[in-house]
Amino acid sequence: MLKDSTFENIDGVERETLSRRRSGRCFSAASSDGGGVNLRGRNITSGHGQFQSEIPLREERPCGRLAPSPTGPLHLGNAWAFLLAWLAARAEGGRVVLRMEDIDPARSRPEWAGAICRDLRWLGLDWDEGPDAGCGMADAGPHAPYRQSRAGRLYERAFAVLDAAGRVYPCYCTRKELRALAGAPHGAADGLGDAGAFYPGTCRRLSPAERRERERAGRHSAWRLACPEGATESFDDAVLGPQHFTLAECGGDFALRRSDGVWAYQLAVVVDDARMGVTQVVRGEDILLSTPRQLLLFRLLGERPPRYAHIPLLHDAAGERLAKRHHSLSLGALREAGVRPEAVTAWLARAAGLGEGVPADLAVRLRREGKFPWERLPRTGLRLSDNVAEALRRGDAPLPEPLPACKNT
């Protein structure tokens, strides 16, 4: 865990005790006097005293997770990722957690959460912990809450540890200024994908007086993690093999909290994976460059990271990555068109090199093999044929074709 010490500098930059502004309200971050956050144990301590957590000790049983964002309908690309994540966990005799990543209130809708649960069950995917059977208001399992919108107090505690260690600073840059930085030479950081544009640490270098000036001008700050200078992260990806990145390649100092008070994805997902005992994360390769950021957060919080597997993405016939705008390829649209769930999962399993079968039968077969065969998965993105929905209904859909490596994202 983080030691009980507070740095007075952020990599050589003067740091003052700040009056925090969050969602238009001032607050003081907890100090490290009482210790740090233990996301796996029962006691969580901070400068405000000791808090009791409902989080049980981390289990050694393998654990995978399904972590949809309820911002729209699930599509074939989501089904591909969730099927592989589910099978990878079941192949090791592991449990599966369903977590709704509804951290952004402006985009998330409860009706989409319910639709997602119905779509997952339609595919034959179940879970051991998560929202109740109807995806209503109750949570079922020892690691609740299973909705990020309800876990703010846990993110707050993790943030306090990072702040007490001198690794957090306020960022007053506006969206317009950030867009200008992204458009500047070397500002876009080619290949960052969804990890975001490179941030050169503009507000990290502000003096205390400059920070106070921005506060007086009414600027609300976001909060960024000050990445250690020259920091690198390495990991062995189950699909892509050994990976090595500098944090600068992944965008530099990244946001932990937005200026409107919404917690950022990077912090939320690390806290949730740690407290839920997630041991393996299967997700699209478009998230690859988020992994070094998350590994750094795991290390700073003293938590053990999961194993990662970044799988290739599905693309439409034109080569565009599947997204929620592909309404005809949503699971709801396929169901209404008369496509059977067994046809979808069997087709996806064959595309992954796993043979045919419904998820339950595939899980039994893989369990007998003793491990998930990552080596069978394709290494490049896959392009669907035209009219794949109708072909799935007929039962004669051709397998997706590999895309050239340069079109993989």
At which residue positions do the language-model features occur?
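Active-site cores that bind ATP or allylic diphosphates and position pyrophosphate for catalysis
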Residues: 176-323, 330-335, 384-408
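Residue-level detector of structural "landmarks"
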Residues: 29-30, 273
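Proline- and acidic/polar-enriched loop/turn elements at helix boundaries
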Residues: 101, 132, 174-175, 310, ...
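Short, mixed-charge aromatic SLiMs
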Residues: 104-114, 316-320, 367-375
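Non-catalytic terminal extensions that flank enzyme cores
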Residues: 20-21, 25-28, 35-73, 96, ...
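N-terminal Rossmann-like or analogous alpha/beta NTP/dinucleotide-binding catalytic cores
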Residues: 51-188, 285-286, 290-303, 408-409
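Short secondary-structure transition/capping segments
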Residues: 143-161, 185-192, 219-228, 351-366
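Extreme N-terminal basic, low-complexity initiation segments
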Residues: 1-22
